[in-house]
Amino acid sequence: QESYLALMDRFQKAGIPIAVAVLDMNWHVTDIPTKYGSGWTGYTWNKKLFPEPEKLLATLHAQGKHVTLNVHPAAGIRPSEVQYPEVAKAVGIDPASKQPVLFDLNNRKFIQAYFNLVHHPLEKQGIDFWWLDWQQGAARSRAQIDPLWSLNVLHFLDQVKEKKDQALILSRYAGPGSHRYPI
């Protein structure tokens, strides 16, 4: 956190304009128990690197910057996340079971929990928009749409609810038609 803010100060002193502060995947905890998979997916602030995330976000906003977080949502919400108990309950999983909440855009309960219990609280802390990253392949069957395409649509529409014509997401290319939503 200190070094990130120091970097922003260096840019400002050098006269280099920065409008968006981007936090790649190390913003969240990546060192998770191996039984839950890799650390690519995560939603719990890494307090070793960012001990006071709200203060960081407030400082960046005070400098006139917008803030985006990089997310790789494919692994869903695992028991290692602070949001896990609430999300598990919301989708009908007993949190004591430690069963991961699978990423499933065909499940309305998951979609509601994903936005309302995971993303919106981070937005309330000061996240302005999301950098959606998906490297886990296309749909699970030929009849389904690429998950990244669906994810982009859902995130963009969610942003429109709050930000109207200021809605924005960043994403990889998700195939034909995907240019409608991300940059």
Segments from the language model and where they lie:
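Catalytic-domain carbohydrate-binding cleft regions of carbohydrate-active enzymes
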Residues: 1-183
